[in-house]
Structures are given as C-alpha cells and as structure tokens.
Curated annotation (Swiss-Prot):
A GO term for molecular function: amino acid binding
Gene: pyrB
Pfam families for the chain: OTCace, OTCace_N
Protein's recorded name: Aspartate carbamoyltransferase catalytic subunit
Amino-acid positions noted as binding L-aspartate in the UniProt annotation, renumbered to this chain: K87, R182, R253
Length: 338
C-alpha cells in the first residue's frame, strides 16, 4: 500500500489513482472483517477522533463515529448549540482547542465551502499534527461520499476481483440538482479519474453548461497509472434519452434548503421530467444499478417503487459501505508520516 501522502483529506481533486486504490484495498479488508462478525479492531486504539458538525447530519456523522469506534478510537462530538461559539468563539479557535486537547483527527462538516481547508491551514501553521477530514463543506466537496459511491459501483460491476478499472468507458448517468450538490462534484472527480463517461441530466438552472469542463484542470498525478486518460462529462436535458444507454444511475436529492428562488418553475414540473420511475427505467434493458446519497425525497427525484422493489437499487449498500470506507480514511490519516 505504501505511504499515505495526505495529511488532510479535503477533496478528491488531488487524489491519484494509487490513492483511490489504497482506500479501496483497506475498505475491502475492513468490510470483510465486518461481514465476518468482527465488531472492533485495535487499529486506532489510543487515538482521539473529534467530529465537529456545524451542519445537521444523521447518516454521515453516525457513519464516521461508528467507523472510528470500530477501529477502537476514542470519539468525542462537538455540538454548536452548546459550545463556546454562542459566546463568540470563532470556528478556527474551536478547532485549535480540540487540537490542543489531543485530537488526532478532526472530522468537519460545514454549510460553507472551504471551511475545512481554512481550518487545516491554520492547524498546519501552528505545527500541530492534527489531521482534518472533510465530511462535507457547502457546495464544494464530500470526499467520503464520493469514495463510497465509487466503491459501491466497482463492487457491483466487479464483485469478486474488485477492479476499479472496470469503470473505464462506462456511462454513468447523474440525475438532478448538480449545482447544489457537493456529492456530485466529488463523484465527478472520482468517476472520471477511472475513465468513466459521466452524463449529467437535469434542467439548465440546476446543471449549467460549464460543468462539462469541471475536471479539465486535472492534477498531473491523476494520469500516472494504467488508465490512459480521464473520462468525459456531457450534459443531457432529457432523462428518457440519456437513460437508454446508461450503465448506472446516480440520483441526486433536490436540495431545496440550498436553492435560490425561481430556479425551478415547480416541483411538480421537475418531477414529471426528472423523477426516476419504473417507466423511465424500463427504457434501459440492462438491469443497471441505481444509487442515491440520501436522504431521499420520494416521488420527487425517485419513485418509491424503485427504492423498495427494484433489485439493483443500491442505496442500502451505499450506507453499509460507508462504514468500512470511512474506517479506511481514518486509518490512512492516522498513518501519515508515521
């Protein structure tokens, strides 16, 4: 596996193919242990992990904290409502305080983009060894979700061999509110790194044309691997047209809490055009996998019949895969420069 090169995990834009494979190799090991009934391993015994969530979260926070506990780490949680923030303390001071308490890793989620990055810079300037793991920041990035989505797709297409290269030239359809989705941005970095051809499907107000060049400034180390080049990003305005040749579909939540007014004529109109229903899915004859990062707005972006009845709906797989994926990230950060 080699040395892990990142002190912080803030985005997937600087991940090399080898970084992805290191994460997935560990994810496979941890998943096997979990499936064998192992509740805890002592990999991070003596480490202190602090989750600092300035934005509401159930799935991500619980998944990270369970991942840390399965690695035998000590876990503490920060609650903004009962913290010194209400007394005027800054976000940076809060992070520095937890670092001074001996936190080895800060798991940070915030509604504004780049807050984890700014905290990591301040920590580095004070020469602390504390790492930052971005659990979602504004519209910018959600690296752990991007990784677990990629892992889930690879497991579907290559369940025994676990070959990420199997995604090369696959057509992955991402449907919905890309504009407000940090998950979509992380998915774009991850999928195109392995040569997948991504089709973004939605109205112009939620998928501007500039998304076609989202990953054009690829870091050089992305291409030093057996895959010759990145995949592509194209845009479709018709779900019926784009689903016909898709190899997989990732449905995104319509993020009404982040949305400016007047981006959609109506929720009803959006659902008529972009809600994934059995009728629309029947236009594809390949029994393709369906993913959704959750939480789900049933009947708005995806039909209940697909969630509850379609055999290749992998939403629960995503949730269960999140724990070993996040175990892998915590473990790798704990080994940085050690």
């Amino acid at each position: 596996m080699g040395n892990w090169p990142h002190k912080h995990i803030l985005t997937l834009s600087n991940f090399s193919i080898y970084d992805y494979k290191s994460v997935f190799e560990l994810t496979e090991r941890f998943k096997s242990l979990i499936n064998a009934g192992t509740k805890k391993i002592p990999a991070l015994q003596g480490n202190l992990i602090t989750s600092i969530f300035f934005e509401a979260s159930t799935r991500t926070r619980n998944s990270f904290e369970l991942a840390a506990k399965r690695l035998s780490a000590d876990v503490q949680s920060f609650s903004p409502s009962s913290s010194s923030l209400s007394k005027g303390e800054t976000l940076i001071d809060t992070a520095l305080t937890y670092a001074a308490m001996g936190s080895d890793i800060l798991i940070i989620r915030h509604s504004s983009s780049h807050v984890p990055l700014e905290i990591s810079k301040k920590l580095d300037a004070t020469n602390t060894k504390t790492s930052v793991l971005n659990a979602g920041d504004g519209l910018h990035s959600h690296p752990s979700q991007g990784l677990l989505d990629l892992y889930t797709l690879i497991k579907f297409f290559s369940p025994e061999l676990m070959k990420p290269e199997i995604l090369y030239s696959k057509k992955i359809l991402i449907v919905g509110d890309v504009l407000h989705s940090r998950v979509a941005r992380s998915n774009l970095w991850a999928l195109t790194a392995f040569g997948a051809n991504v089709i973004l499907c939605g109205p112009p107000t939620l998928i501007p044309e500039e998304f076609t060049s989202f990953v054009s400034s690829s870091p050089p180390n992305q291409l030093r691997d057996p895959i010759s080049s990145r995949g592509s990003i194209t845009i479709s305005r018709s779900l019926e047209d784009s689903i016909k040749d898709a190899d997989a579909v990732i449905v995104l939540r319509l993020q009404k809490e982040r949305m400016m007014e007047n981006l959609l004529s109506s929720i009803k109109s959006y659902s008529e055009n972009y809600c994934l229903t059995p009728e629309k899915l029947s236009m594809n004859d390949k029994n393709i996998p369906i993913l959704h990062p959750g939480p789900i707005n049933r009947g708005i972006e995806i039909s209940s019949r697909i969630v509850d009845e379609y055999p290749n709906c992998l939403i629960n797989d995503q949730v269960s895969n999140g724990i070993p994926t996040r175990m892998a990230l915590l473990y790798l950060l704990s080994k940085f420069n050690k």
